Swiss-Prot record:
PROSITE patterns: RIBOSOMAL_L11. This is Large ribosomal subunit protein uL11. GO terms for biological process: translation. NCBIfam families: L11_bact. SUPFAM superfamilies: Ribosomal L11/L12e N-terminal domain (SSF54747), Ribosomal protein L11, C-terminal domain (SSF46906). One of its GO terms (cellular component) is cytosolic large ribosomal subunit. PANTHER family: 60S RIBOSOMAL PROTEIN L12, LARGE RIBOSOMAL SUBUNIT PROTEIN UL11M. It comes from Ureaplasma urealyticum serovar 10 (strain ATCC 33699 / Western). Keywords: Methylation, Ribonucleoprotein, Ribosomal protein, RNA-binding, rRNA-binding. CDD domains: Ribosomal_L11 (cd00349). The keyword Oxidoreductase does not apply.
Length: 150
């Protein structure tokens, strides 16, 4: 006979700082052993210390938990590459920074595991679209795919 499945009580999506998670209100609301989670999370993310890391926590009725660590959000990576604190207030009219195509490709390669893109070129276009919405230009890259024909 197959083992019984655990009953899920909550699935929480949180953004935590790599290597620096602490027990607090956000974790308390999930209903897990916070000390055990923070120790495990900090050990797993110690190489990404200080970066914002999305995590999906599945809490079970018996107070046990599973979690999945995702890659850092594109907006944080773009701001870090451009060395800015925030994007443009009006990105259609204002460009606050420019990054190189190599920097954008590096971000695309890093994010490819969490994206729906099948190759680096498609991932680069997605990164370019996010950058455009933040008022960040990428040298030699358009946020839009050129139309063939016409």
């Amino acid at each position: 006979m197959a083992p019984k499945k655990k009953e899920v009580t909550r699935i929480a999506k949180l953004n935590l700082i790599g290597g620096q998670a602490k027990p607090g209100p956000a974790l308390a609301s999930v209903g897990i052993n916070m000390a055990e989670f923070t120790k495990s999370f900090n050990d797993k993310t110690k190489d990404q210390n200080g970066k914002v890391i999305p995590v999906i926590i599945t809490a079970y009725k018996d107070k046990s938990f599973d979690y999945v660590v995702k890659t850092t959000p594109v907006t944080y990576l773009l701001k870090d590459a451009a060395k800015i604190k925030s994007g443009a207030k009006d990105p259609k009219k204002q460009v606050v920074a420019t990054i190189s195509k190599e920097q954008a490709l590096e971000i695309a390669r890093y994010k490819l595991v969490d994206m729906t893109a099948y190759d680096e070129e498609a991932a680069l276009r997605m990164i370019a679209g996010s950058a455009k919405q933040m008022g960040i230009a990428i040298e030699g890259v358009s946020a839009y795919k050129e139309k063939k024909g016409n």
